[in-house]
A protein has these predicted regions:
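N-terminal small/polar loop signature for handling phosphorylated ligands or for N-terminal nucleophile
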Residues: 1-44, 53, 156-167
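Acidic-glycine-rich active-site phosphate/pyrophosphate-binding loop
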Residues: 7-10, 92-99, 120, 186-193
Length: 217
């Protein structure tokens, strides 16, 4: 989500004295709402919050997920871009108070978005699972379970995106891939994501597509 758009949302929210946010969408929408939640209680420019990297003073936020991918519905992270300078940085706020995950909301997604979401989820897990081998057998087995689920369901989703159970597995995999669970006691390397962010900032490529390009094969 771009800071230019989010500044407008923050200004409108302050004018209307907004005290609760409901983000309905995918990772970009939820990420943007996290910065809005912080910006509503900040007197300066919201980009300053992004460059600081974090803010724990926010208005409450809930989410309704429509595109599984980023795990933003169950973590406190966000990624915010700035079109003017072609920059893209991580930002950390508060966790959503609740998130609603209804697989039926994914039935009409374009297949390209689904593919990008699957790639994003897969790389999230890989950047935790593959960094240092053998740190935690329990976390390794959990990570492998998510990876195996993605490998199994991806071709099935391509053939039948209206299967409730398939899309439920996809949604849960995306959430579990980046909610901190499989990261417990595990070193992480996010180089693939950092390079992917640069490709998005400089060339406007979809995040999941950049990860599919960059992840070592």
């Amino acid at each position: 989500q771009s800071i230019e758009t989010l500044r407008e949302a923050i200004a409108l929210g302050k004018e209307r004295e907004v005290d609760f946010l409901l983000a309905v969408g995918g990772g970009s929408v939820i990420d943007g709402a996290k910065l809005i939640a912080a910006g509503l209680l900040y007197d300066g420019d919201a980009w300053e919050l992004v460059r600081k990297g974090a803010s724990q003073r926010t208005v409450p936020l809930g989410t309704v997920l429509t595109i599984p991918a980023t795990g933003s519905e169950m973590n406190n992270g966000a990624v915010i871009s700035r079109r003017e300078t072609k920059e893209k940085y991580p930002f950390y706020g508060n966790y959503p108070l609740f998130s609603i995950l209804d697989p039926e909301k994914t039935f009409t997604l374009p297949q390209r978005q689904v593919a990008c979401g699957l790639a994003d989820t897969f790389v999230h897990v890989m950047e935790q699972y593959m960094t240092v081998a053998g740190q935690s057998r329990v976390m390794d087995r959990w990570a492998e379970g998510i990876l195996q689920t993605l490998v199994e369901i991806a071709p099935e989703i391509r053939e039948n995106q209206h299967d409730y159970d398939l899309m439920a597995d996809f949604m849960l995999s995306a959430t579990m891939g980046l909610n901190g669970f499989i990261a417990m006691g595990v070193a992480q390397d996010w180089a693939t994501h950092m390079i992917g962010h640069e490709l998005t900032a400089l060339h406007g490529l979809t995040h999941g597509a950049t990860l599919a390009i960059v992840l070592p094969g």
